[in-house]
C-alpha cells in the first residue's frame, strides 16, 4: 500500500482586527440584549486603553518565546504519541469538506474580515481526538464550524459521543444561522451548541464532563483565558489534552502552564501558535 502524504501546515492570513465601526456596532448590539449584559460589561473593560496596551506588550514578549519552541503539526502529533500517515482533512473527507466549502461560499457575512473566523488547526484536533478515542469533547469558539466538523468526524464512530461547543452570538452580524454552517445534518445529533459567552456557557457545558479533550478559541484577553483554562483543565480526565489557539497573544498560556507545572507542546499553525498540554 502506498503511504499517504504527510500533513503540510495550511497557511492562513492571520487574525485581522475588527474595524472600530464593527467593534462599536458589536458593543451596541450586545447592550441591547439583556442576556449579554455581563459579557457587554467585560468587553467594555477590555477596550480601555490601559488594558489594550498591556495585552499588546505581552503579545510581543510571548510571541518571541513561543516561536522558539514551536514545531510543525506533524512533529507535534508524533511527540504526542501518534504514528502512521496523516492527511489533510480535505483529502481524508473530500466530499464532506467540499460540501462545507460550498456552504461557506453562500454565506453573505464577512466573518474573516471581522477577525472572528481564524481557522483552527483542524488536523491537530481531529487526530488527537482519534488518538484518545474521545467520547466527550469541549470547545469554545465556533464561527463557521470547521473545528467542530473536524472533532465530530473524529468522534462519530463512538457510541454516545458528544461535542459541546460554546460560542457567543454574533448579534451585530445577524449571523446566527451561519454559525456552524459547515457541520452536516448527519453529525448534528452528536453536537450541543451553547450560544452564550464563555462565563455563562462554559459552566453549562462543563456539567457533562469529564472530557477527553478541551479546545479554547474564544475570548483572547488574558483575563478571559485565565478564567477559562483552570475550569477546562479541572474537567479533563487524566491523559486528556487542553489545546489553546493564539497562545502568543499574551502571557496567559505560559502563566497557566507554570501554575499546573506542565510543559506544553507549541505548534506552528499558519501564522498562529497553538499550545497543547497533556494532563497527568
Protein language model annotation of sequence segments:
Residues 8-90:
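N-terminal auxiliary segments of SAM/dcSAM-dependent transferases
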Residues 67-80, 94-105, 176-184, 203-208:
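Short charge-dense sequence patches
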Residues 79-121, 126-131:
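Class I SAM-dependent transferase core
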Residues 1-7:
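N-terminal acidic, proline/glycine-rich, low-complexity intrinsically disordered segments
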Residues 8-15, 20-27, 111-280:
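S-adenosylmethionine/decaboxylated-SAM
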Amino acid at each position: 500500500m502506498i503511504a499517504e502524504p504527510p500533513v503540510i501546515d495550511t497557511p492562513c492570513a492571520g487574525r485581522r482586527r475588527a474595524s472600530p465601526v464593527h467593534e462599536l456596532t458589536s458593543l451596541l448590539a450586545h447592550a441591547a440584549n439583556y442576556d449579554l449584559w455581563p459579557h457587554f460589561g467585560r468587553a467594555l473593560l477590555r477596550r480601555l486603553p490601559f488594558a489594550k496596551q498591556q495585552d499588546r506588550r505581552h503579545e510581543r514578549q510571548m510571541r518571541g518565546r513561543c516561536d522558539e519552541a514551536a514545531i510543525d503539526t506533524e512533529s507535534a502529533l508524533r511527540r504526542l504519541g501518534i504514528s502512521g500517515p496523516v492527511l489533510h482533512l480535505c483529502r481524508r473527507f473530500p466530499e464532506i469538506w467540499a460540501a462545507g466549502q460550498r456552504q461557506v461560499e453562500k454565506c453573505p457575512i464577512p466573518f474573516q474580515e471581522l477577525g472572528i473566523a481564524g481557522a483552527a488547526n483542524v488536523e491537530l484536533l481531529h487526530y488527537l481526538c482519534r488518538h484518545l478515542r474521545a467520547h466527550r469533547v469541549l470547545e469554545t469558539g465556533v464561527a463557521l464550524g470547521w473545528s467542530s466538523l473536524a472533532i465530530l468526524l473524529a468522534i462519530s464512530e463512538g457510541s454516545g459521543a458528544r461535542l459541546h461547543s460554546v460560542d457567543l452570538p454574533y448579534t451585530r452580524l445577524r449571523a446566527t444561522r451561519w454559525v456552524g454552517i459547515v457541520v452536516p445534518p448527519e453529525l448534528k445529533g452528536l453536537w450541543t451548541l451553547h450560544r452564550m459567552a464563555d462565563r455563562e456557557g462554559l459552566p453549562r457545558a462543563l456539567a457533562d464532563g469529564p472530557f477527553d479533550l478541551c479546545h479554547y478559541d474564544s475570548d483572547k484577553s488574558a483575563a478571559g483565558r485565565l478564567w477559562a483554562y483552570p475550569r477546562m483543565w479541572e474537567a479533563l480526565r487524566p491523559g486528556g489534552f487542553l489545546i489553546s489557539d493564539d497562545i502568543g497573544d499574551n502571557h496567559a498560556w505560559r502563566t497557566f502552564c507554570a501554575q499546573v507545572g506542565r510543559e506544553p507542546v507549541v505548534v506552528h499553525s499558519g501564522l498562529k501558535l497553538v499550545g497543547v498540554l497533556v494532563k497527568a
